[in-house]
From Swiss-Prot:
Signal peptide (UniProt feature, chain positions): 1-26
This protein's domain notes: The PDZ-binding motif is involved in the interactions with PARD6A and PALS1.
Originating species: Homo sapiens (Human)
Membrane topology according to the record: Single-pass type I membrane protein
Chain's gene name: CRB3
Carbohydrate-modified residues: N36
Subcellular location(s) of the protein: Apical cell membrane; Cell junction, Tight junction
Name the UniProt record assigns to this protein: Protein crumbs homolog 3
Subunit structure and binding partners: Component of a complex composed of CRB3, PALS1 and PATJ. Interacts (via C-terminus) with PALS1 (via PDZ domain). Interacts with PARD6A. Interacts (via intracellular domain) with EPB41L5. Interacts with WDR83.
Extracellular side: 27-59
One function term, GO molecular function aspect: SH3 domain binding
One GO cellular component term: cell junction
Record annotation: effect of changing N36D: Abolishes N-glycosylation. No effect on localization to the apical cell membrane
Region (Interaction with EPB41L5): 84-120
Length: 120
């Protein structure tokens, strides 16, 4: 049960995130008077021994943490909505909860009893 808005958010959000955190992947911004471009250094996001740089690891952790938090929030919202819907449609009828509290109290002893009925 995927949300189409989530795909749109990922499609639009990840390039923005990459543009903002480009240096975490080893990109260097160079600006001159006549051009704007991104230049990749000779060693990109991995060092000479094949391990990722700490900035890249941090960026990956942040992205997946945000994604997990978003999925958790959406899941909890759907769960709450479903529980409210079930509570409204599949409740049980308990007439005892609708009874008045004073109805179960025995009558006080000083009340007069009605006269006894007799046969004609």
């Amino acid at each position: 049960m995927a949300n189409p808005g989530l795909g749109l958010l990922l499609a639009l959000g990840l390039p923005f995130l990459l543009a903002r955190w480009g240096r975490a992947w080893g990109q260097i911004q160079t600006t001159s008077a006549n051009e704007n471009s991104t230049v990749l250094p000779s060693s990109t996001s991995s060092s000479s021994d094949g391990n990722l740089r700490p900035e890249a690891i941090t960026a990956i952790i942040v992205v997946f943490s945000l994604l997990a938090a978003l999925l958790l929030a959406v899941g909890l919202a759907l769960l709450v909505r479903k529980l409210r819907e079930k509570r409204q449609t599949e409740g049980t009828y308990r007439p005892s909860s609708e009874e008045q509290v004073g109805a179960r109290v025995p009558p006080t002893p000083n009340l007069k009893l009605p006269p006894e009925e007799r046969l004609i």
